[in-house]
Amino acid sequence: MLPEQVRVLVVDDEPAICRALSIALTRAGYDVLTALSGDGALSLLAQEHVDVMVIDLRIPDTRGDVVFELAAAIHPHLRHQTLFMTGDISERAHKLILSCKCPSVRKPFELKELIAAVAGLVPHRGRGRDARGQSA
């Protein structure tokens, strides 16, 4: 990882989503780690520094908001540098996202929307390349 490169952890129980986001974010200039479960994410976070976490709100083993709270206890900056993804439009999901005070993208989303949201979470550092591959 280059010193100026931002490291992003993508957490989703769907391997295809993790793979697609990993490819898109890597092409945008980010260093990407992936986890297919909440437990996997917490295990990675215990060993690795990440700058931004992108997490699905609904993960079978541990809800995304619970992982968020535990992750923020390990890396306090993640309290302000986490992006939620969700296809859940319930009032409960909406309240959870609001209570965490983190941005979210609704599934299905455009990759450029997610990349822009990630870039917005790291204004103080180099952002790699934008969705078109241009320098930020």
Question: Where are the regions a protein language model picked out?
Answer:
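Non-catalytic signal-transmission and effector/linker regions of two-component phosphorelay proteins
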Residues: 1-9, 73-76, 94, 110-136
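Charged docking surfaces used in two-component/phosphorelay signaling
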Residues: 19-27
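Acidic, metal-coordinating helix/loop segments flanking the phosphotransfer/catalytic sites
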Residues: 34-52
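Acidic catalytic/metal-coordinating carboxylates
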Residues: 37, 63-67
